Amino acid sequence: MAAGVTATELRELADDELVQKLKESKEELFNLRFQMATGQLENNRRLRVVRRDIARIYTIMRERELGLTVSPEGAEEGAA
């Protein structure tokens, strides 16, 4: 995960995969903050990238909750 994840890539994930990705990103952010506090963080930009990834995940989850977009699982069920 050197670069951020695009919204298009996240929209292709199922709901449970999205929750897992959110959990991983939050853990990474925690570790980065810890490294920052101890002076071990080499790439400060990574903090910003991970925070934005988390925001993208929350946005996509909210879109699905409001019915603005359909999860890939729902699209497959409707087509079948």
Curated annotation (Swiss-Prot):
Superkingdom, taxonomy of origin: Bacteria
Record GO terms (molecular function): structural constituent of ribosome
Pfam family, one: Ribosomal_L29
Organism: Saccharopolyspora erythraea (strain ATCC 11635 / DSM 40517 / JCM 4748 / NBRC 13426 / NCIMB 8594 / NRRL 2338)
SUPFAM superfamilies (alphabetical): Ribosomal protein L29 (L29p)
Family, similarity comment: Belongs to the universal ribosomal protein uL29 family.
Gene Ontology cellular component terms for the protein in this record: cytosolic large ribosomal subunit
Keywords: Ribonucleoprotein, Ribosomal protein
Protein name (database record): Large ribosomal subunit protein uL29
Biological processes per GO annotation: translation
Xref: NCBIfam families: L29
